[in-house]
């Protein structure tokens, strides 16, 4: 799962979970482009597919600790472990999953899988 992005299925699931506006913002694409990707009207560029897969993994980690509303809010809430920044703030322009900011976001979400408390 870690290295197998499937934009069509992950995109529709994340769109349903996060909502079009938040998902487009996190992917750093316009809502119109996202709609076209999800409808299959336009091919998903590789960098966007990688971001989509990354967000699906993060959302999967969060699902064990938060309900759908909590998952959506998690991305915009400042976190002490992120130096007071929100996860969305660390997903900076043209981010790649292997960049330091996104790695910190993934590590924080992944830590919830092992935490007995939220």
Regions found by a protein language model. Give the residues of each.
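Non-transmembrane "mature" sequence context
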Residues: 1-118
């Amino acid at each position: 799962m870690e290295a197998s992005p499937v934009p069509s299925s992950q995109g529709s699931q994340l769109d349903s979970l996060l909502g079009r506006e938040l998902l487009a913002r996190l992917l750093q694409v316009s809502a119109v482009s996202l709609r076209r990707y999800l409808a299959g009207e336009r091919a998903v560029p590789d960098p966007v597919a990688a971001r989509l897969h990354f967000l699906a993994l993060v959302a999967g980690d969060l699902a064990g600790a938060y309900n759908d509303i909590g998952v959506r809010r998690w991305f915009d809430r400042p976190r002490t472990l992120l130096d007071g920044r929100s996860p969305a703030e660390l997903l900076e322009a043209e981010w790649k999953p292997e960049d330091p900011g996104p790695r910190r976001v993934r590590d924080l979400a992944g830590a919830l899988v092992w935490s007995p408390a939220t």
